[in-house]
């Protein structure tokens, strides 16, 4: 019975079994087209063409023989912009053009406001907009533009001085500069100081001519050297009623008595030009503390010197005691009459009572006295008609009770040089030691007793 089977039936069964296995292995989904068929949904990754895949034999990247030059499918006129774009007419602007026009008009309206603000802050006239962008050359255009007031330019130059006045004041400035340049700070401060005297006192002063050379002295404090210009004396001496200084009065009374024993010290007519050379317009006097000193009718100077500043060794006007003589109250031509110590002996007033009334001392105030005792020895040469003059010395000593004693020393004559002590016994004006009340000064200022006396040898050598 086995031999009787048909072999064809066995072959059909085998084919069916193989097809079933293929169907089980095949993925679920649409069946891929055969490679020869073209599917426009596919795109080749190698060449980027549509209709085949990268595994297809139609891809030119795998089969260069089958590669063909791509041919254009047809000419399309709508894609290329062969004709240029024509601008639209301004009469019918589009919506975009309307927005642009509004934005341009806004800054144009803000321009006048900006120009007005700039005109307010800068002061410049605003620029007038020209019509049609053309400049007008009409002569009346400037009247239409608002403009501010013109600025006034002032010059800081000083007015010129008349050459005649400049030449006349040059001599005064030269004399004044030679004197003020040689003054020490204490001496400059003493020019502005004043002390009070009784209202009933009347003093007259005589000024002596001042020659150019000066005398040095030996001392621990800086010396006062004055080199004023020499001026020719004019006329007689001026008398100052109740305005002359106390220093002038005492020295004038002392000089006539000293002429017998000291012929060198002589009175000379006061030169008015010397007052100008020293830069003072009037004689200063010792007036009451609350009143201003009276002024004598002497020629006033054109330019007064500036008030000197107070240094460590200088004092204001209120620092001088009322009943004592201050340091350098009146800067007059005779240097011997320029400075005296803080006090003058009462004996000098008694001896000169025949010519000058006695000095009435007022009770001392609670003001501090001079912080330092300055060297007051001044020497001068007389006129050419005299042989020579001697310096006037004032000796200051500090006592134990805090007071000061002053003594007036007269230098010996030029021909018979002697020691100051020996001449002290001969001179009738030698004042005894007198005590003047004074407020205590700190020891840092008065570090030692200042004793001012120059030897006759030094003064004689300087005079020669």
From Swiss-Prot:
Composition bias, Basic and acidic residues: 74-89, 97-114
Region described as Disordered: spans on this chain: 1-42, 70-389, 415-437
Superkingdom as given in the UniProt entry: Eukaryota
InterPro entries: FAM90, Znf-CCHC_6
Chain intervals with Low complexity compositional bias: 180-197
Similarity comment: Belongs to the FAM90 family.
Note: Primate-specific FAM90A gene family, thought to have arisen during multiple duplication and rearrangement events.
Name by which UniProt lists this protein: Protein FAM90A11
Gene designation per UniProt: FAM90A11
């Amino acid at each position: 019975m086995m031999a009787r089977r048909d072999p064809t039936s066995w072959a059909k069964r085998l084919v069916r079994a193989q097809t079933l296995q293929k169907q089980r292995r095949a993925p679920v989904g649409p069946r891929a087209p055969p490679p020869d068929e073209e599917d426009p949904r596919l795109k080749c990754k190698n060449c980027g063409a549509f209709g085949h895949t990268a595994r297809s034999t139609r891809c030119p990247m795998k089969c260069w023989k089958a590669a063909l030059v791509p041919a254009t499918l047809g000419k399309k006129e709508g894609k290329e912009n062969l004709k240029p774009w024509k601008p639209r007419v301004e009469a019918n602007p589009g919506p975009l053009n309307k927005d642009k026009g509004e934005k341009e008009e806004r800054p144009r309206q803000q321009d006048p406001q900006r120009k007005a603000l700039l005109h307010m802050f800068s002061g410049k006239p605003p620029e007038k907009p020209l019509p049609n962008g053309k400049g007008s050359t009409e002569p009346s255009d400037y009247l239409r533009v608002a403009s501010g007031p013109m600025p006034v330019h002032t010059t800081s130059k000083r007015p010129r001085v008349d050459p005649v006045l400049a030449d006349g004041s040059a001599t005064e400035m030269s004399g004044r500069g030679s004197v003020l340049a040689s003054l020490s700070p204490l001496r400059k401060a003493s020019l502005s100081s004043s002390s009070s005297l009784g209202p009933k006192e009347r003093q007259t002063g005589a000024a002596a001519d001042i020659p150019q050379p000066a005398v040095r002295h030996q001392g621990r404090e800086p010396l006062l050297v004055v080199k004023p210009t020499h001026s020719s004396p004019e006329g007689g001496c001026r008398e100052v009623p109740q305005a002359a200084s106390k220093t002038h009065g005492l020295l004038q009374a002392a000089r006539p008595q000293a002429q017998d024993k000291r012929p060198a010290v002589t009175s000379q007519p006061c030169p008015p030009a010397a007052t100008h050379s020293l830069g003072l317009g009037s004689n200063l006097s010792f007036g009451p503390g609350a009143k201003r000193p009276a002024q004598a009718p002497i020629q006033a100077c054109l330019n007064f010197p500036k008030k000197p500043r107070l240094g460590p060794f200088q004092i204001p006007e209120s620092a001088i005691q009322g009943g004592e003589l201050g340091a350098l109250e009146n800067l007059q031509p005779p240097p011997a009459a320029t400075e005296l110590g803080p006090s003058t002996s009462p004996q000098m007033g008694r001896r000169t009572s025949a010519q000058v009334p006695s000095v009435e001392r007022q009770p001392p105030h609670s003001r501090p006295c001079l912080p330092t005792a300055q060297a007051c020895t001044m020497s001068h040469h007389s006129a050419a008609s005299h042989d020579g003059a001697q310096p006037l010395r004032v000796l200051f000593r500090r006592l134990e009770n805090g007071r000061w004693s002053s003594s007036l020393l007269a230098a010996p004559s030029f021909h018979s040089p002697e020691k100051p002590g020996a001449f002290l016994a001969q001179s009738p004006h030698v004042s005894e030691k007198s005590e003047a009340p004074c407020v205590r000064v700190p020891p840092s200022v008065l570090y030692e007793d200042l004793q001012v006396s120059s030897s006759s040898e030094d003064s004689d050598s300087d005079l020669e």
